Amino acid sequence: MSSPQTSNRMTLRPIELKTANAFVTTLHRHHKPVQGHRFSLGAYVGSSLVGTVSVGRPVARFGGDPLVVLEVTRLCTDGTADACSFLYGAAARVGKAMGYQRIQTYILATETGTSLKASGWTDEGLAGGGQWKHTDGKPRRTDQPTERKRRWAKMLS
């Protein structure tokens, strides 16, 4: 992109993972920062960061070929109107420009997905949830929601 893209009063900028993770640490309701990413984007109003999206390889074991499929692993906003839709749409456009064929994400089953629907994503239904165990039988982290998830996706090609 040669110049920042705007939607209403928001501006899109690439950001470093540490910036996205700091935002998530401060504002995300139920998740911690991510370990890695392919790219992260920030939504700004003026000079204020109002939302971030981190996009990486598919996390689930059978989530898709990481050279073809991207996954939104974190999206976090400060509540600014339309920031979620702005970031989901931007993530899909950037993924398409990079040559990916599909982008997906998982949200809690109790979340509505309104921003995803507004951005042209498709609800693919319930997927996953619960809690896995380590191969040695020890329980995994319990600081994340264990309820069912809904997978949403958008074809990019």
What are these regions (language model features)?
Residues M1, L156-S157:
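C-terminal end-of-chain micro-motif
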Residues T11-P14, R38, V45-G46, T52-R148:
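Acyl-donor binding region in acyl/amide transferases
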